[in-house]
UniProtKB/Swiss-Prot annotation:
Sequence motif 'HIGH' region, residues: 42-52
Protein name per UniProt: Leucine--tRNA ligase
EC number, UniProt record: 6.1.1.4
GO MF annotation, one: leucine-tRNA ligase activity
Any one biological process term the GO annotation gives: leucyl-tRNA aminoacylation
UniProt family annotation: Belongs to the class-I aminoacyl-tRNA synthetase family.
Enzyme class: ligase
Gene3D superfamilies attached to this UniProt entry: 2.20.28.290, 3.10.20.590, HUPs (3.40.50.620), Isoleucyl-tRNA Synthetase, Domain 1 (1.10.730.10), Valyl/Leucyl/Isoleucyl-tRNA synthetase, editing domain (3.90.740.10)
Keyword line: Aminoacyl-tRNA synthetase, ATP-binding, Cytoplasm, Ligase, Nucleotide-binding, Protein biosynthesis
Catalyzed reactions: tRNA(Leu) + L-leucine + ATP = L-leucyl-tRNA(Leu) + AMP + diphosphate
């Protein structure tokens, strides 16, 4: 071994060995139970950030641990390569998106390899590869023929900056999730996948995913939003039209005081004819998005149409209002408004002076107070005709039956979930494989013409997709009639590619099919790792896509991911100065000097360049916008990959936020250097005799017990609890104990325990710091590489103790500690405690009233 810890040399040596041996190539025929570990693949933005490093280190530690358990492990890596940033970069730098993307992939692949992740690189692909997205196009045409794909003109969220449609999930606080632009409503022809056909299965199967965080399952349940209610019809006075509405609260039907219409509703358009004020209001409503969360928080506005709706049970006429909070895409574009029992309706009615009529009360004796807000709980009906006096639950059933009997409504199930709009008016995405023929309509591209290849040598200038200006791309002939036709110029939502990539990794080299029998061998993924921000986007779409592929006969399993780990964010301090224009200039923590008080708490900060103060902001997620990121490459260059890996696993449990600390990174480096030195000095001391447990003295026996206690703890922490930080802490404690023992120049028998302890520490650290342990394992005398070694086993006999330590308290205060035989009973413990000199100093002259013995732990003496 080298005299000093040289990370760069050690890591190059280990990686060279893994490459030569093809250590991480997954083989279907290999013995052992399969284990498929997958971290969400990255968008090739150009460089790894610390969030990537944390995510992929967690996955790599789990993969390497499972390999040490004898399992046949698959851990692949690829690239989620389509998306808007490539187009933005093309406009900014004049580089085609394809070239920008592939150059970034080269850079990031090198960074991942430098970190020593155990990926099977033979399975690598990028979603922008035509041989990948051809199968996505192929499946789309199958779904079209099944009726699971359809096209309709829909009111959509339009991002005016990115010039594309956004799914509701991609609108955050009324703004586009990438551009930050205020979203508008537009009517655009769109392609949709019928995810609602799978709503019940997607909902019910959540109960079969106990390995998922309950928070994620709850988010999906809420997003799917199954509800049981009634669809009912309000006639329009003086019109042949009826308005169909859906309600989960038919028990409040007698409290309806107005009906709300979506601005896009045909009746609203009719009311606006010859009414410029109404036309302006409807146009103004279209400036907001159609995301439900944003509708809920915006100011409620409306206009009276002058039309009246006829109550289906009482015949009462109530006003019809156009309201900006009613969505055409939800229900039927109309809502029955019950201000007394719905807070949104109450706010609207209060603003415009509409009636508020309570018809449900907390009890028969207690009236609902709706002067300050709606009463939204269940209760007892009043002023509701024949249904007065019924509890809400009974009234819902009875009123539903009444409406059905009159032919004015029906009980039904509804969902918040909408069909998935997958059309995007962008260039850098997979082309939608449809052809528009004047004679035949929409026609899918035949299998023999797939893939529809995205032309890569184009100029991206903004203002929408360049495909619509490329006759060479869109001019084609109809597959059915042979006439002139036009190719679809929209591309798939990029969530399409990430909805099935995990399955393609099982058979990435398959040229003749989307998937083959290897998909059933590897799927479902045993451990999936990624951020909770994907709970209702990627994770729901992937579950849906898995069921589509199953029903196409491509695989047999029902769910894609057996277990899900949602890792916490990497967070760091932020510093800024206010600009004159109200904006902020953000400074990287490395540019700032922080002054701290005597307890180490930050009190002020100055910029190193000029010595002037900066404002200490919140501790936030590392981001470019806040300039509080740390470059992983700089850390690797300075400390080595193993230090970066060790720090990310030690700083916090994987599901919690990791607060960045430069000093803790330095501490991780010092520990690895100390561990390396322990092995080096031990090896330099010469040959080690075989372990003879019978010949060990008490000190060696205690050290051996520490070794096996550490193995037991680490096995549980890494294998079951995923609390890698506590496993690392246990190894650090063990190394401290080994270092103390080594300093005492141990005998031959004790050196055998040192050998056993260093081997155990090496094996436990191997998944976390694989490079230095590769070198140390060989130095400890092993012919096989540590990558092929098994996880250490606990010797239960080593855990037994001849003596135990008991804490002795007098009146609840610690007064002494006793060493007793491990088999000492309560009486012996009590007698020893009362006879102890230290204890007697506190019981002398007092009467012992009670002695409480907790076996193996403590004795508490009550005396006064």
């Amino acid at each position: 071994m080298d005299a000093s810890y040289q990370p760069e040399q050690i890591e190059a040596q280990a990686q060279r060995y893994w490459d030569e041996q093809q250590s991480f190539a997954a083989r279907e025929e290999r013995e052992g139970e399969k284990f498929y570990c997958l971290s969400m693949f990255p968008y090739p933005s150009g460089r790894l950030h610390m969030g990537h490093v944390r995510n992929y280190t967690i996955g790599d530690v789990i993969s390497r641990y499972q390999r040490m358990q004898g399992r046949n492990v698959l851990q692949p890596m690829g690239w989620d390569a389509f998306g808007l940033p490539a187009e933005n970069a093309a406009m900014k730098h004049g580089v085609p998106p394809a070239r920008w993307t592939r150059e970034n992939i080269e850079t990031m692949r090198g960074q991942l390899q430098r970190l020593g992740f155990a990926y099977d690189w033979d399975r690598e692909f990028a979603t922008c590869d035509p041989e990948y997205y051809r199968w996505e196009q192929w499946l789309f045409t199958r779904l079209y023929k099944k009726g699971l794909v359809y096209k309709k003109t829909a009111t959509v969220n339009w991002d005016p900056v990115d010039q594309t449609v956004l799914a509701n999930e991609q609108v955050v606080d009324g703004r586009g999730w990438r551009s930050g632009a205020v979203v508008e409503r537009r009517d655009i022809p769109q392609w949709f996948l019928r995810i609602t056909d799978y709503a019940d299965e997607l909902l019910e199967a959540l109960d079969e995913l106990p390995g998922w965080p309950e928070q994620v399952r709850a988010m999906q349940r809420n997003w799917i939003g199954r509800s049981e209610g009634v669809e009912l019809d309000f006639a329009v006075a003086g019109h042949s039209d009826t308005l169909r509405v859906y309600t989960t609260r038919p028990d409040t039907l007698y409290g309806v005081t107005y009906v709300g219409l979506a601005p896009e509703h045909p009746l609203a358009a009719e009311a606006a004819e010859g009414n410029p004020e109404m036309q302006r209001f409807i146009e103004d409503c279209r400036k907001g998005g159609v995301a439900e969360a944003d509708i809920a928080t915006m100011e409620k506005r409306g206009m009276d149409t002058g039309l009246k709706a006829v109550h289906p049970l009482t015949g009462e006429q109530v006003p019809i209002w156009v309201a900006n909070f009613v969505l055409m895409e939800y229900g039927h574009g109309a809502v029955m408004a019950v201000p007394a029992h719905d807070q949104r309706d109450w706010e609207f009615a209060s603003k415009y002076g509409l009636d508020i009529r309570p018809v449900v009360h907390p009890s028969a004796e207690e009236r609902a107070d709706v002067s300050e807000g709606a009463f939204t709980d269940d209760g007892v009906l009043a002023d509701s005709g024949e249904f007065s006096g019924l509890p809400s639950a009974e009234a819902r059933q009875a009123i539903g039956e009444k409406l059905e009997g009159l032919g004015k409504g029906e009980r039904t199930v509804n969902y918040r979930l909408r069909d998935w709009g997958i059309s995007r008016q962008r260039y850098w995405g997979a082309p939608i494989p449809m052809i528009q023929c004047p004679a035949c309509g929409d026609v899918p591209v035949p299998d023999e013409d797939l893939p529809v290849v995205l032309p890569e040598d184009v100029d991206v200038t903004g203002g929408g997709s360049p495909l619509k200006d490329l006759p060479a791309f869109y001019q084609t002939t109809c597959p059915q009639c042979g006439g002139e036709a036009r190719r679809e110029t929209d591309t798939f939502d990029t969530f399409m590619e990430s909805s099935w990539y995990y399955a393609r990794f099982a058979c990435a080299d398959q040229k003749g099919a989307m998937l083959d029998e290897r998909a059933d061998q590897w799927l479902p993924v045993d451990q999936y790792i990624g951020g909770i921000e994907h709970a209702i986007l990627h994770l729901l779409y992937a579950r849906f896509f898995h069921k589509l592929m199953r029903d196409e006969g491509l695989l047999q399993s029902d769910e894609p991911f057996r277990n899900l780990l949602t890792q916490g964010m990497v967070i760091a301090e932020t510093y800024y100065r206010e600009r004159g224009d109200g904006g902020k200039d953000w400074y990287n923590p490395a540019e700032v000097t922080v002054q701290r008080d005597e307890r180490g708490r930050p009190v002020s900060a100055v910029l190193e360049d000029d010595g002037e103060p900066v404002v200490m902001g919140a501790i936030e997620k590392m981001s470019k916008s806040k300039n509080n990121g740390v470059d992983p490459q700089a850390l690797i260059d300075r400390y080595g990959a193993d230090t970066v890996r060790l720090y990310t696993m030690f700083a916090a449990p994987p599901d919690q936020s990791l607060e960045w600390s430069d000093s803790a990174v330095e501490g991780a480096y010092r520990f690895l250097r100390r561990y390396y030195g322990l092995v080096r000095d031990h090896v330099a001391a010469g040959p080690v005799p075989a372990l003879d447990v019978a010949s060990l003295d008490d000190a060696a026996r205690d050290l051996r017990r520490k070794v096996h206690e550490t193995i037991a703890k680490a096995s549980d922490d890494v294998g079951r609890r995923y609390t890698f930080n506590t496993a690392i802490a246990a190894v650090m404690e063990l190394c401290n104990a080994l270092g103390k023992a080594a300093a005492n120049e141990p005998s031959g028998a004790a050196r055998a325990v040192l050998q056993e302890g260093l081997e155990a520490a090496t094996l436990i650290l191997a998944p976390i710091a694989p490079h230095v342990t590769h070198v140390c394992w060989q130095a400890l005398g092993h012919d096989e590489a540590v990558i092929d070694a098994r996880w250490p086993a606990v010797d239960e006999s080593a855990l037994t103790r001849d003596t135990i330590e008991l804490v002795v308290q007098v009146n609840g205060k610690l007064r002494s500690r006793l060493q007793l035989p491990a088999d000492a009973d309560k009486a012996a413990a009590e007698a020893a405690a009362l006879a102890d000199e230290k204890v007697q100093r506190f019981t002398e002259g007092k009467t012992v009233r009670k002695v409480i013995v907790v076996p193996g732990k403590l004795v508490n003496i009550v005396a006064n």
